[in-house]
Amino acid sequence: MGLGASSEQPAGGEGFHLHGVQENSPAQQAGLEPYFDFIITIGHSRLNKENDTLKALLKANVEKPVKLEVFNMKTMKVREVEVVPSNMWGGQGLLGASVRFCSFRRASEHVWHVLDVEPSSPAALAGLCPYTDYIVGSDQILQESEDFFTLIESHEGKPLKLMVYNSESDSCREVTVTPNAAWGGEGSLGCGIGYGYLHRIPTQPSSQHKKPPGATPPGTPATTSQLTAFPLGAPPPWPIPQDSSGPELGSRQSDFMEALPQVPGSFMEGQLLGPGSPSHGAADCGGCLRAMEIPLQPPPPVQRVMDPGFLDVSGMSLLDSSNISVCPSLSSSTVLTSTAVSVSGPEDIGSSSSSHERGGEATWSGSEFEISFPDSPGAQAQADHLPRLTLPDGLTSAASPEEGLSAELLEAQTEEPADTASLDCRAETEGRASQAQATPDPEPGL
């Protein structure tokens, strides 16, 4: 005896309705529920007519297990039940239950909802509970709304047995009430009665189970109060999943670490504990969950792309002709860079090894300043864009890798003050220029 697989509501909508199930009867042992269960099949015979088929098949299977198909109005499902009809169980009938042939729909409509219950009333003395009790049957057949009130009036001052279903306990019980119009209040029962669509028993799913108090529905995130703290260094009560790529906890994606859920306060404890603490060693072995810092990669360095063309030459300084020596024994080196030459104002000549390394040449011939780069692949193209400077006639300076000084000597010359030989040569040059201006040209014809 037991429950089998459930199915949907059968066609026809009629069967034998169980009104009452006796204690320790074969029907109770099989799990049949009063008021909600309808026997629709016994063996392989469909019970869709009001006849003696049910009684005949029960008598034919006395002390033998027989299968019944039962429809439940509360779950709206059909289940299979195995029952053993017997006349040896100590009560009346082979099943120990009272049945009546009717339709499912009409049986679900005949429900009287108990509303407010007055204190010391006949309903309160009988133990009726307000708003949770539903009167579903009695010793007599109740088919209409007025049948219940007629039954109460006919039992004035007499005990009356009622079958009552309680929605909180989800069970039916038998209640004995004695209607009394002189109890001191209104009505014969002293309670409100509701009837109709809004007062029917609510249907329940077949898989519904009572949950313990405080249980969390599936899929609900746990709050802080529901988390259980475990001491550091102790193994957790659940298995820790290990990733095949390594012993790290969490999943690593794009240089970011996904931290596992941590107990509040454990993050600070994990940071305060040093590498030599006992809990730190236990955490390295994978024995406990500890807080992990999320490694953050620094941003890549900013790559700046320089302008490949020539820069503005207005901010750079050019050679001062007054500092150029005309002595044949001294050769001056011109500062040449690959970017620009300035023509702003008079500045001292700085020395560099760039002209020596590149093999550059600077020449003052006549009144033009020319620069050439023989070793450069684009020397001809760059020479057209270089500036030209007009200098006095007779001043010429040439620098070549063979005749020029080394980079170290040139730097030493720029740091040291001009020697006396350079000053003498400079004075001689200025004297010759002044004589040439003072001496007038001979007039033609004299």
From Swiss-Prot:
The keyword S-adenosyl-L-methionine does not apply. Keywords: Golgi apparatus, Lipoprotein, Membrane, Metal-binding, Myristate, Phosphoprotein, Protein transport, Repeat, Transport, Zinc. It is a peripheral membrane protein. It is found in: Golgi apparatus, cis-Golgi network membrane. Disruption phenotype: No visible loss of Golgi stacking in intestinal tissue at postnatal day 10, 21 or 42, in combination with conditional knockout of GORASP2/GRASP55. However, cisternal cross-sectional diameters are reduced and rims of the Golgi cisternae are vacuolated. Abolishes expression of GOLGA2/GM130 in the cisternae. PROSITE patterns: PDZ_GRASP. Phosphorylated by CDC2/B1 and PLK kinases during mitosis. Phosphorylation cycle correlates with the cisternal stacking cycle. Phosphorylation of the homodimer prevents the association of dimers into higher-order oligomers, leading to cisternal unstacking. Disulfide bonds: none annotated. GO terms for molecular function: metal ion binding. A lipid is attached at residue 2 (N-myristoyl glycine). Residues 14-214 are annotated as: GRASP. Residues 14-104, 110-198 form the PDZ GRASP-type domain. Zn(2+) binds at residues 17, 19, 102. Residues 343-354 have a biased composition (Low complexity). The modification Phosphoserine is found at residues 365, 367, 376. GO terms for cellular component: Golgi apparatus; membrane. Transmembrane segments: none annotated. InterPro entries: GRASP55_65, GRASP_PDZ, PDZ_sf. Homodimer. Forms higher-order oligomers under interphase but not mitotic conditions. Dimers of the protein on one membrane might be able to interact with dimers on another and so stack cisternae. Interacts with the C-terminus of GOLGA2/GM130 under both mitotic and non-mitotic conditions. The interaction is critical for the correct targeting of both proteins to the cis-Golgi. Interacts with TMED2 and TMED3. This is Golgi reassembly-stacking protein 1. It comes from Mus musculus (Mouse). The gene is Gorasp1.
